[in-house]
Amino acid sequence: MRKKIIIGNWKMNKTKTEAENFVKEFNKITSELNLKLDKNLVAGLALPFTSLGIKKEGNFANLVIAAQNFHQNNSGAFTGEISAEMLLDLGVKMVVLGHSERREFFHETDEIVNMKMHQAIKNNLVPIVCVGETELQYNSNKSKEVIKNQIEKSLKNLSDFSKIIIAYEPIWAIGTGKTATVEYAQEMCKYIRSLTNEKTIIQYGGSVKPNNIKELLSQKDIDGALVGGASLNVKDFIDLIK
């Protein structure tokens, strides 16, 4: 049985002080609710680099900490970059790779994502590899063609699909308030599974909120969610994972 994995992606939001306040409020509310995570659920947050070393205490210690990016080389003259070894030293367990914002604003290619994926696995980090189509591609009925191409290139030479997570995020639904229908999200995640295998954990991302996550996660081929804005509010995040 595949686990459900819900990761909140904070993107470039919250200072370290704000993150520490989030932890305090998270611990306070979850203690009052006597909240215990489902044994089949892994929940976590992809934090900015400045907050990755945040102290894990109380119920917050049950969450997995993920990074939002790292460099494909172990070390070297790469000013401003972070290595897998540095992430591991901070207790990071997962890393988001190939997010559409990285692809668009920093010109990350499938080939770069592929190198990062292999580097993550080599260093015992779980890569969350993001794929998704633009609104133009969606309207042109090219969604599956685009996803297949991204999967083939980003996951090239991957021998064990149980070592990764794939996050399907239709770009037209990220931060727009538009959400793919549950049927469409399931159809695309099922298609991704046909390109990988039954062991692959597949998340859906794109305007996921407390009021739609339950229906999304009830689908056969949707194993979790990569959540943006809703994870920034501690009460909303708790509603997502409880």
Swiss-Prot record:
The keyword Nucleotide-binding does not apply. Its EC number is 5.3.1.1. Keywords: Cytoplasm, Gluconeogenesis, Glycolysis, Isomerase. One of its GO terms (biological process) is gluconeogenesis. Pfam families: TIM (PF00121). Substrate binds at residues 9-11, 175, 207, 228-229. Pathway: Carbohydrate biosynthesis; gluconeogenesis; Carbohydrate degradation; glycolysis; D-glyceraldehyde 3-phosphate from glycerone phosphate: step 1/1. It catalyses: D-glyceraldehyde 3-phosphate = dihydroxyacetone phosphate. Homodimer. Belongs to the triosephosphate isomerase family. PANTHER family: TRIOSEPHOSPHATE ISOMERASE (PTHR21139:SF42). Involved in the gluconeogenesis. Catalyzes stereospecifically the conversion of dihydroxyacetone phosphate (DHAP) to D-glyceraldehyde-3-phosphate (G3P). This is Triosephosphate isomerase. It comes from Mycoplasma mobile (strain ATCC 43663 / 163K / NCTC 11711). The gene is tpiA.
